[in-house]
Amino acid sequence: MSTNGHDPHPESTKDKVLVPEELRPRVPKAMSVAASDSGAGAGIQSDLKTFAAHGVYGTTAIVAITAQSTKGVYAIAEVPDEVIVAQIDMMMEDIGADAAKTGMLSSALIVEVVADRLGAWGVPTVVDPVMISKSGDQLLQRNAVNAVKRHLIPMSRIVTPNIPEAEVLSGRTILTEDDLREAARAIHALGTEWVLIKGGHRTATATDVLFDGVEFIEMPSERIQSLNIHGTGCTLSAAITANLALGMAMVPAVEAAKSYLTGAIRAGYAIGGGHSPVNHFYRFPEMGPSAAQGTSDGARAISTTDGDR
């Protein structure tokens, strides 16, 4: 008790005013189920920054911890499956999510656990089938590919592979436009609603293709060389997730996400000695050194897979 007669906890006084629940502003919410990147350029950290930049409240379920920098991935420690389940269930039970995304899920067990819980909660899910990092490090165990195809893709709203990932998921080599479309059909047949194959790994063009099972929508991009390419795949899928949480339909959600990524790459920071990260907050010049760069979403399009991951 206070010796001077004053309440030491003024927040507990009777004159405290509580805002009624119905008057509190509703905030769109999104969940990222992925790995932690100690360099903060990709993974959970990148997803949270992307959500925040879109005005979306982000929650997480961390499935692995990586020792990672702009130069590569040096160690991976998986989180026990019961802890992954607890993270997803506790967040969904309390906070909920208008949309979710998956990133690096390194093992078949983790893939199955995540697919089961997100499917049980019925949250619209963006599946970013992360397999290999930009530095060439294997992030998805080879025996986990079938789990992705059998468990994760069927419960997803959209799958966002780059060319190498699309080849693995479809079992097809992609050299031509026809190859890409056949791969999209094969991936769509696994049970997802939409497929976005990111074309930046093709040398001749940098056209992303969005497919809903009926119509192919080509999204051409100008290929721009940049060192700020770490985490671009994570950022794109997180931006799509944020836009879905905001209530956007799929086509405009993807278009807006591509535009956001363009600006984030152009305003990227010079950080580290490898592939530098993008600037997730380029729209807010007061938050970083990009104020003088004059970046905007009106900038020319950029391939969403130049430096994917």
Explain the meaning of each model-derived region:
Residues 54-59, 217, 243-258:
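Phosphate-handling active-site elements
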